[in-house]
Regions:
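Surface-exposed beta-strand/loop patches in extracellular or lumenal glycoproteins
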Residues: 470-480
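C-terminal beta-rich recognition modules with glycine/proline-rich loops and embedded aromatic residues
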Residues: 2-8, 219, 283, 352-360, ...
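Solvent-exposed beta-strand/loop surfaces of large extracellular or lumenal domains
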Residues: 482-505, 522-528
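Extended ligand-binding groove/face enriched in aromatic
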Residues: 67-81, 91, 96-197, 201-233, ...
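Low-complexity, Ser/Thr/Pro/Gly-enriched N-terminal "stalk/linker" regions
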Residues: 2-85, 109-130
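Catalytic-core region of carbohydrate-active enzymes that cleave or remodel glycosidic bonds
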Residues: 266, 272-293, 316-371, 382
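Solvent-exposed loop and edge beta-strand segments that line ligand/cofactor-binding
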Residues: 7-8, 20-21, 68-86, 102, ...
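Well-ordered alpha-helical scaffold segments within catalytic/enzyme domains
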Residues: 37-39, 88-103, 152-167, 200-211, ...
Length: 629
């Protein structure tokens, strides 16, 4: 197939082909030009992506392909899904090409795409663990072999390369694999689903690129087959695989958090293409369940280590939080699709959730160098915490199960896609980011320029230049935690409407200004979140704060702090100053009521949660006990 200018214009991760409530803008059309997000994207391009490429070599992922074509004698290394690490890095490179136009990675892309193409067999099948270790077990143990999951990441990488660079070499590989799935599991074929969802959302995106409806039909079939007991549950139970109940009847999220959230992204994609209202209703119910009862303050998900799973409603322990980085990535994808779909929560709620996730859970998952990563993201780390394989005390340069680092790389490269969207008569600014946004054709040939130091500075200035169609509007989200703010322009001040956005005329030459309050605020949890009852967290703008042992003078310890009823004040840079007492030492594990009163009074520094752990292993906590009146 030929990749047209239209495809290039839609260089974005999710591009609905039907009339969605909101339409995405291509990554080249939304340029992050300053501030935190732009700097992060530059670090991602200069450090994270090259580091991932190095680790693909060091971890044996590329050798796994080479051994299939006779270019390596090494044994297969890594998990059954290790191929997906390569595909996610390819996708990261693709979105970086869309963002910056870089040619830095062209030679590497040529080599790895050629390698994958040569490893693919005549049937279209490609999966290095099965081909090289268990060639007689193709599609026989779908609970654990991740064949479709890995293929889903292959498809997403191929679509991204086609949209961003016009390359169809990997797309040919991906389509051959997708055609194999259609032949084997499509209409008239076997009923089967993958133990780890991902293929569903990928097939829909492949349909959007190619207009081949069999891909959409297979994705829809796989959504419909959930809950029919097709997967052997084993000791983790069918909830783990989201195979306990049909998707349309599953109103609460359960089981492996990443699997659930990828499945929901796929279900929402299917709705966006076929308009099945019953799917959207189920997704509305699940979205409310996840974000009102199962999301950490940082925008992380997953309370249990054993099966990387959601816990019960309000089961959100800070110190034992699993909070896998990939779960936040998966929810970003799902929540964006819910925004495009016009879900019941409304665009402001979706955009606010994504903002929380990006500035906190996702940002904390990578260090200041861009080369060390958290897999699990607890909101409290005790001083004697033991390192576990996927939950180390410090960020690691890579993991045996390395799903998270490439996921971070591909997500950061595509952040511009989530800043704004369009409707028939309006441009919607969802994120207050320093950016240049080209209007889509239906709104004119102009540019909306946003200048801001947010989230360090609450002032946002917006200028409209170029040609704009008559009657167009600009809709700017005003954060819920800044209810007194208004968008001020030539025709006066405009406050947020019921939808959370200020609506103003989109007119060439217009200038608007918004002052967002960045006053520190104290946040409490729902009373059923027993793990943090009697505690508060400190937030400023979209940032969650924490206290880290590295900022405390001896003999203070972070787990002894009690927050006093005193104003939280600004410190140096993005830090805050808290007034804390210390809980007195007690001789036993239990004691009589009332507890001894906290002692002394100390000024304590709080830092953004996203920055913790950059000074070595250190105790930390987000939720602080409060002193009794």
């Amino acid at each position: 197939m030929t990749i047209t200018e239209e495809h290039a214009r839609l260089a974005t991760p999710a591009a609905p082909s039907t009339a969605s409530a909101h339409r995405p803008l291509g990554i080249p059309a939304v340029r992050l030009t300053g501030g935190f997000l732009a700097a992060w994207q530059e670090r991602n391009a200069d450090a994270t992506i090259p580091h991932c490429i190095e680790q693909l070599e060091a971890s044996g992922v590329l050798d796994n392909f080479r051994r299939l074509v006779g270019e390596s004698q090494a044994e297969h290394r890594g998990f059954v899904f290790a191929d997906s690490d390569l595909y996610k890095v390819v996708e990261a490179v693709a979105w970086e090409i869309a963002r910056s136009g870089t040619r830095t990675f062209d030679g590497w892309l040529d080599d790895v795409v050629d390698l994958v193409a040569r490893a693919q067999d005549d049937s279209g099948y490609v999966h290095t663990w099965i081909q090289g270790v268990r060639p007689d077990q193709r599609f026989t143990e779908l609970e654990w072999t991740h064949e479709m999951y890995v293929g889903g990441h292959l498809i997403q990488a191929a679509v991204a390369l086609a949209r961003s660079a016009g390359r169809v070499d990997l797309l040919r590989v991906a389509r051959r694999f997708a055609d194999l799935l259609v032949d084997r599991f499509g209409p008239g074929g076997a009923d089967a689903i993958c133990g780890h969802p991902e293929i569903e959302t990928a097939l829909v995106e492949l349909y959007r690129l190619t207009a081949e409806r069999s891909y959409l039909h297979l994705a829809a079939k796989m959504i419909d087959l959930r809950g029919r007991g097709l997967l052997r549950a084993g000791n983790l139970g069918d909830h783990y695989f989201q195979d306990h109940r049909p998707v349309r009847e599953a109103t609460s999220a359960t089981g492996h958090a990443v699997r659930q959230l990828y499945l929901n992204a796929g279900a929402t994609d299917v709705y966006l293409e076929n308009g099945d209202a019953s799917l959207l209703a189920a997704m509305d119910a699940q979205w409310a369940d996840v974000h009102e009862r199962k999301m950490y303050l940082s925008g992380a998900f997953g309370s249990r280590h054993r099966d990387e799973a959601f816990g019960d409603d309000y089961e959100l322990p800070s110190d034992r939080a699993y909070a896998e980085t990939c779960a936040t990535v998966a929810d970003l994808q799902w929540t964006w699709r819910m925004l495009l779909a016009g879900g019941a929560a409304g665009p402001a709620r979706y955009a606010e959730t994504m903002e929380r996730e990006v500035y906190n859970a996702l940002a904390a998952a990578v260090d200041a160098s861009g080369t060390r990563f958290f897999y699990a993201n607890p909101l409290q780390l005790r001083p004697d915490r033991r390192t576990e394989e996927n939950a180390p005390r410090e960020r690691a340069s890579w993991y045996g199960c390395a799903c998270c680092p490439p996921n971070i790389a591909r997500t950061v490269a595509q952040l511009g896609a989530y800043v704004a969207s369009a409707t028939d008569d309006a441009l919607w600014l969802h994120q207050l980011a320093d950016a240049e946004i080209d209007l889509p054709d239906e709104l004119g040939a102009g540019t909306v320029r946003v200048r801001t130091g947010y989230p360090s500075d609450g002032r946002v200035e917006i200028e409209v230049t170029g040609e704009v169609v008559a009657g167009a509007h600009l809709c700017v989200r005003i954060p819920r935690w800044s209810p007194g703010s208004a968008l001020v322009g030539p025709d006066g001040a405009h406050r947020a409407g019921d939808d959370g956005y200020a609506h103003v005329p989109l007119v060439a030459g217009s200038r608007y200004a918004l002052e967002v309050s960045l006053a520190p605020r104290l946040t409490r949890a729902h009373h059923r979140v027993d793990a943090v009852r009697g505690c508060v967290a400190v937030e400023r703008g979209p940032l969650v704060y924490c206290v880290e042992q590295a900022d405390l003078p001896a003999p203070l310890e972070v787990d002894d702090l009690v927050l006093l009823a005193a104003p939280v004040t600004a410190g140096d840079g993005d830090t805050l100053r808290l007034r804390c007492a210390t809980a007195p030492a007690e001789p036993g594990l239990y004691g009589p009521e009332p507890a001894p009163r906290p002692q002394s009074d100390h000024e304590v520094t709080a830092i953004p949660f996203s920055r913790w752990g950059n000074r070595g292993a250190s105790a930390m906590r987000v939720w602080l006990p409060t002193a009794a009146p």
